[in-house]
């Protein structure tokens, strides 16, 4: 019986850690398409992707380092 609070606490910490996102990112259980530098015209199907951290709505994913940045900060191709 003494292990129950410890197990609950451990599960809570693990669940919280999974949803910590990087700068300019947010967690979504049902993310749509994520904007990427240089691919702003790419079509986006209206369906859920896998749950994950994705760039905030006004941010673009910079490749290759994966940071989320404003569109104006995207490298020019």
From Swiss-Prot:
Signal peptide: 1-17
Listed GO MF terms: serine-type endopeptidase inhibitor activity
GO cellular component: extracellular region
Keywords: Disulfide bond, Protease inhibitor, Secreted, Serine protease inhibitor, Signal
Occurrences of domain TIL (ranges): 21-74
Disulfide topology: 21-53, 30-48, 33-44, 37-74, 55-68
Site (Reactive bond): 46-47
Location(s), subcellular: Secreted
Known role: Defends the organism against the host's proteinases.
Name of this chain's protein: Serine protease inhibitor 1
């Amino acid at each position: 019986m003494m292990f129950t609070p410890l197990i609950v606490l451990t599960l809570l910490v693990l669940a919280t850690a999974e949803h910590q996102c990087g700068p300019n990112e947010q967690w979504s259980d049902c993310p749509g398409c994520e904007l990427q530098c240089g691919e702003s015209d790419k079509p986006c199907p209206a369906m859920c992707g896998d749950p994950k951290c994705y760039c905030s709505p006004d941010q673009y994913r910079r490749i290759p380092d994966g940071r989320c940045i404003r569109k104006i900060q995207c490298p020019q191709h």
